[in-house]
Amino acid sequence: MTFAFTGFVSFGLPEDLVITLEEKFINEGSPKNLSLFYDAAPGCREAHGGNHLAHRGLIRRIHGGHLDLNRKLAALCSENAMPVFMVPQDVNSHLLRAIAGGEPGIVTKIGLKTYADPRQDGCRANQAAWDCGETVVELLNIDDKEYLFYKTFPIDICFIKGTTADTDGNVTVEHEAVLNPILELAVATHNSGGKVIVQVDRLAQAGTLKPKDVKVPGLLVDAIVVGKPENS
């Protein structure tokens, strides 16, 4: 099962949802063996975000954009507790759109002749990524020009963060400091047949939100959780 969530450092983190996931694993031993995807860097050194997921058995694989802001996950990466692939953030953003559109992947020059190039590390961040035999990127030659092909994958469940949701599930982001790709992730998950759970600061009645303020339409949202003020 592939699980994804948004966040850029501590901005736009669905913190209550991630904490609840951690507590459920600690108390019940499930879910487990999740394949984790995030586009950027959702965490803050040794607290918040992905650091709550740093438990052996909870995460079996990581596909992300940056690991240093999730120090506890980074420690597990160094211990080869799971395969870790670090993919350029811009590629991850485009992958969400490609997943939403049902495409097999994206073709781009981003990452050529860098660690992302399969002739070098192919986005592998630890030995476990080499040992697992999986690949996330391939080298293509089109009209005598080199490109990289990054593969898409289905997303089974995602957590996103908004400010307000109405009772129909429409989400606005008026108090969010960073506009994370919550729409792209929601569409990618929905079109994969997955579930979209949103954490918000408050709940409003249907019909009270201005249509132009809505960032994620309610038809994409499966569940709404009103979070704690300290985790907004």
Annotate each predicted stretch with a short phrase.
Residues 1-232:
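Conserved alpha/beta enzyme-core scaffold
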